[in-house]
A protein has these predicted regions:
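Sec-dependent N-terminal signal peptides
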Residues: 3-15
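Ser/Thr-rich, low-complexity intrinsically disordered terminal regions
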Residues: 18-137
Length: 137
């Protein structure tokens, strides 16, 4: 009996574990009152500025500079009932001929891999929102 309980716990933790290539974090919040406000506060806590696009179920941020590498990331939160789905994109700045960094022309999805700065920001927002996290592609 104990073995079955241990196997059940291990299997559930493996299902919700981060895998290389994951691009989304889905958070299920127990209490969905003021969930929009919670997500906004989580973004602001990590120095993101919210873009006001008048969409009641989606929050998007302006690009934010990474602290260690020359690049930017932009995050999006889609809110539906008590679920929040976080995704993001990043772009690396280019060094021009005069030694100045230029804004990225292309952005790519933030994916999970060891040492991903964008994923750390995405997960930081998810942890501030609270609730049960699940990771997917």
């Amino acid at each position: 009996m104990k073995l079955l309980v241990i196997l059940g716990v291990l299997c559930s933790s493996l299902v919700n574990a981060q895998n290389i290539g994951d691009t989304k974090i889905t958070i299920v919040v127990n209490d969905n009152t003021d969930i929009y406000k919670k997500v906004k506060i989580a973004f602001v806590d990590l120095d993101f500025i919210i873009k006001d696009n008048y969409n009641i179920d989606t929050l998007t941020t302006y690009p934010r500079e990474f602290s260690n590498i020359p690049g930017q990331c932009r995050l999006t939160a889609v809110i539906k009932d008590n679920k929040v789905t976080l995704t993001g994109i990043y772009g690396l700045k280019r060094l021009d001929d005069f030694g100045y960094f230029r804004s990225p022309k292309e952005y790519q999805n933030i994916i999970y891999y060891k040492g991903s700065k964008g994923w750390e920001l995405l997960k930081g927002v998810a942890e501030r929102i609270g609730g049960q996290m699940a990771f997917s592609k």
